[in-house]
Structures are given as C-alpha cells and as structure tokens.
Amino acid sequence: LGLDKSMISLGSCTMKLNSVSSLTPCSWPEVTSMHPFAPESQTAGYRELLESLERYLVSCTGFDACSLQPTSGAAGEYAGLLVIRKYFERIGQADRNICIIPRSAHGTNPASAAMCDMEIKWIDDSRGMDVEEFRALCEAHKDRLAALMVTY
C-alpha cells in the first residue's frame, strides 16, 4: 500500500493532496533522524526552517501567530476548530458556535466539532453539495455560524 500505488482511504486527506515527489524529503535521514533530545546547538537548521515557515504563514493569513502542530487528521481538525472558537470568543461573538457538516463526512468531523462545544448542522450531500440548500442553511444560522467542514 502506498500513495503512489493505490488509493489511500479515510483519514488521509492531507496525503491525497500532496504528490509523492513532494513527500520525498520526508524520507531523507537528514530531515527525519533528529533526536527529540538533540542539543540546541545541533538543531539550528531545523529551527530556522520551522520559524521561517511560521513567519510565512502568519504573513499570508494575517493571523497574529500560527502553530505547526498538529499537522493533519482529527488532531488538525480539532486544532482548527479551537482557533475558530477562540477567535469568536475574543471578538465578543462566543455565541457563534454552529458548524455545518455534510452527512457523508467521516466521523472525526462531528466529533471534533462536538469537542469544541459546537452545534452541528447537517447538510445532505447525497447528490453532491446543493448550493441553494447550503445558502439557505447559512442564512438560517447567519448570526451563529462559525464554521463549515467539508472533506472528501
């Protein structure tokens, strides 16, 4: 089983969006073999790489800061939804807690939303995402809408 040989199923959205060639550096020992307790004097290159990525992401998004962990999967969903919840709390709109999720979403989507105290509103996507139904759902909850989670 491999990304370049067969379909990767549930829980691998991030992997599906990256070509195999872009993942090659992830197999290089120079990238993957740093020991977690390596002395600071031996990790300057890693720190420079990660800190410049953080600065780049902050400049692109307009956020005050960013986190490179967690990177994907249910932990990434949860982290993203926590950011959304905290944002609305910070601007005095803590009542914005509705998350629209397609019925076909994998179970981590509603689980992550529920763990963030979000109220889930389902959208039927058995015929694909109906734009008019989506607009109507957004309009019906416009004062409390916080997020939309769409996976494939």
Language model: regions and residue ranges:
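Gly-rich Lys/Arg/Thr-decorated short loops/hinges at beta-loop-alpha junctions or inter-strand turns
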Residues: S27-S41, V58-S59, A114-W122, K142-V150
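Conserved PLP-anchoring active-site segment centered on the Schiff-base-forming lysine
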Residues: Y87-G107
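Active-site nucleophile and cofactor-binding loops and adjacent substrate-binding regions
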Residues: L10, S67-A75, I101-A105
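Flexible inter-domain linker/hinge segments
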Residues: L1-S9, T14-S21, C26-T32
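Conserved N-terminal alpha-helix of the aminotransferase class I/II PLP-enzyme fold
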Residues: V31-T71, G76
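Active-site phosphate-binding strand-loop segment of PLP-dependent enzymes
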Residues: M129-Y152
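Short beta->alpha connector loops at strand-helix junctions that form conserved
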Residues: R103, W122-S126
